[in-house]
A protein has these predicted regions:
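Long, compositionally biased intrinsically disordered regions
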Residues: 1-41, 334-344, 348-349, 356, ...
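Active-site rim segments in enzyme catalytic domains, especially the processed small/beta chain
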Residues: 389-393
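Domain-scale recognition of functional cores that engage charged ligands
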Residues: 7-8, 14-15, 32, 36-356, ...
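Conserved catalytic alpha/beta cores of large enzymes that bind or transform nucleotide phosphates
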Residues: 129-135, 264, 269, 279-317, ...
Length: 485
């Protein structure tokens, strides 16, 4: 039984009691594995575009008249980026020396190459409050790239990108950035400082909105017996619902096309041409696919769903060829209803990069409960390694997900889809954590590009490795994509 205090706490967060009870039930039942048919590969599931096709889709994007908005998840702190340096600082404080060849030693040896170089005590300045405090800052506010007359943060590099592929005919560039509440002021101050500079440089007008993960998307933690985890003061412990919680933020944006890329996946401007080129290709592909979907739905309206066999076969072929949606045999009247339902969904085109490491999470062909197949992006934790078919599919994976998405989010009547209705709630995650030394179970919502977009028409397109340049550790800033040696 929940106490009155706990019920008030749930209501204050905007969490419906029914949602709360469903979350508790999820802990008890767990989340089922999806049925994997195969890894998506160039043979089936990933489009490899010819030079002519690439040129065509760039032209489609450049002539697109709709409203494009960049969406940048940027709420994570840079703690992991500096993990090795924190450990080294602790060892130095204990009287130990830096191990030769260690990440911290490489950091110190190359300190002059970093854009935030300062000749003072580097580790202290980089990590701790009353100095740079980089260890607890968001990645978006850390200087990544050094230029002749300026240094740039990832946030600024996204402003530059937006001007080069998301500027409309009026010169407007729209961008929504999700940030944590405690760091929003820092982003707003940086934006105010640099906005005019980049507007003049790129002849554009920025419209940047900062949003926060909504408290109603947080999920209660439970103890190891699946009872709500209670803190010492009697209140419940809620934890962030993961990046899937950002679906609510995405759903609030009024745009025709949303371009999604993580905050740390940027390059210095001299290498930006390929990134811009491929972003335009993905935008062109997504908007062309959407136009074809709209044409079929309007034709179905005109015919009042009394479709000739040839058109039914054509639509089935389109869904299978473009989105890997294979529809099983069924009576014709039921089939037309299924085809309409499958067509009338948001469209996303996702860049996929060739695997160079161990296979794991990435693009897969999934068999759904309704008997149809679809393309899905899975995390490694969603794959049942004990299932031979799933394990073999994972071993056969050729590409991974760099989080490079273009989403067309309006229907054929010009109305915004309610994206919250196109998810698979049974694709969440459960993990074990701790709070103040006590073990607990934490639950995450279906990932933003995973189960949160399960019921979308999805196409995967092979993109080059140069479009994927995340900064996971501070030493990644020494790679040629980020550093001028």
């Amino acid at each position: 039984m929940l106490s009155e205090q706990q019920l008030q706490q749930i209501q204050a967060r905007g969490v419906a009691v029914e949602t709360f009870e469903t979350q508790l039930e999820n802990f008890k039942k767990g989340f089922p594995y999806l049925t994997i048919e195969a890894a998506a590969t160039p043979a089936k599931g990933i489009k490899v575009l010819s030079e002519d096709e690439q040129t065509k889709y760039i032209s489609v994007a450049e002539n697109y008249g709709g409203n494009v908005c960049k969406f940048v998840p940027a709420s994570g702190a840079a703690t992991r980026m500096f993990k090795d340096l924190f450990e080294a600082a602790d060892k130095l404080a204990a009287g130990e020396k830096l191990a030769e060849g260690s990440p911290a030693a490489k950091f110190v040896e190359n300190i002059s190459l970093f854009p935030f170089f300062d000749a003072q005590n580097i580790l202290k300045l980089t990590l701790y409050p009353k100095a740079w405090n980089y260890g607890s800052m968001p990645k978006g506010l850390i200087q990544f790239h050094k230029y002749e007359n300026e240094n740039r943060t990832p946030f600024e590099e996204h402003l530059v990108e937006g001007a080069l592929y998301a500027k409309d005919a009026n010169g407007d560039v729209r961008m929504v950035v999700t940030v944590s509440v405690e760091h929003q002021q820092g982003f707003e101050e940086l934006y105010a400082q640099v906005k005019e500079k980049y507007e003049k440089r790129f002849n554009c007008k920025y419209h940047v909105t900062f949003t926060n993960q909504q408290p109603s998307t947080d999920i209660v933690a439970v103890d190891m017996d699946n009872n709500p985890f209670t803190k010492d003061d009697g209140s419940l412990l809620f934890r962030p619902g993961g990046h899937g919680a950002l679906l609510a933020n995405l759903n609030d944006i009024d745009a025709d096309v949303l371009v999604i890329k993580n905050i740390d996946n940027v390059v210095k401007e001299s290498l930006l041409d390929e990134t811009i080129r491929w972003k335009k290709i993905l935008v062109g592909k997504a908007t062309e696919l959407q136009a074809k979907v709209f044409a079929y739905l309007r034709k179905m309206d005109e015919m009042q769903d009394n479709l000739p066999c040839e058109l039914v076969a054509e639509i089935k072929g389109f869904l299978a060829d473009e989105f890997c949606v294979a529809v099983p045999e069924m009576p014709s009247e039921e089939l037309v209803k299924v085809l309409r339902k499958k067509l009338d969904r948001p469209v996303r085109v996702c860049g996929m990069v060739k695997n160079e490491g161990e296979p794991g999470g990435g693009p897969y062909v999934i068999l759904g409960q309704d008997g149809t197949t679809s393309l899905q992006i899975l995390e490694a934790a969603q794959i049942d390694k004990n299932n031979p078919q799933a394990f073999n599919a994972m071993q056969g994976a050729t590409h991974f997900n760099p989080v490079d998405l273009v989403c067309a989010v309006k229907n054929y009547k010009g109305e915004k889809f309610n994206l919250l209705q196109h998810t698979d709630p049974q694709t969440g995650f459960i993990s074990e954590k701790s709070f103040q030394g006590r073990p607990l179970k934490a639950q995450e919502l279906p990932g933003l590009w995973n189960g949160a977009m399960s019921d979308w028409n999805t196409q995967f397109v092979e993109t080059p490795l140069i479009t994927f340049n995340p900064v996971k550790t501070v030493l990644d800033l020494l790679r040629e994509q980020h550093c001028n040696r």
